[in-house]
Amino acid sequence: MDCCTENACSKPDDDILDIPLDDPGANAAAAKIQASFRGHMARKKIKSGERGRKGPGPGGPGGAGVARGGAGGGPSGD
């Protein structure tokens, strides 16, 4: 007895809730949920050692090149 062949798993269209998209409370709740999830994913990436960078890293086009080690083109203090 497979529930998917008997259509017991699928919901009819009548059971789907119609949520108004212009509700300020719903928009605020959705924004809070999204911010929470994005923070969770950012902390997860940091914990696993990944960097969430978009675009080229140091040394790439428009990058800073050698940014550490004191060999940059900044003021030397001499």
From Swiss-Prot:
Phosphoserine modified-residue sites: 36
Molecular function GO labels: calmodulin binding; phosphatidic acid binding; phosphatidylinositol-3,4,5-trisphosphate binding
Expressed in which tissues: In the cerebral cortex, found in the cell bodies of neurons in layers II-VI, and in apical and basal dendrites of pyramidal neurons. Is not found in the dendrites in patients with Alzheimer disease.
Entry-annotated residues carrying N-acetylmethionine: 1
Gene: NRGN
Organism: Homo sapiens (Human)
Protein name: Neurogranin
Role of this protein: Acts as a 'third messenger' substrate of protein kinase C-mediated molecular cascades during synaptic development and remodeling. Binds to calmodulin in the absence of calcium.
Stretches for region Disordered: 39-78
Similarity section: Belongs to the neurogranin family.
Site note Crucial for interaction with calmodulin, residues: 38
InterPro entries xref list: IQ_motif_EF-hand-BS (IPR000048)
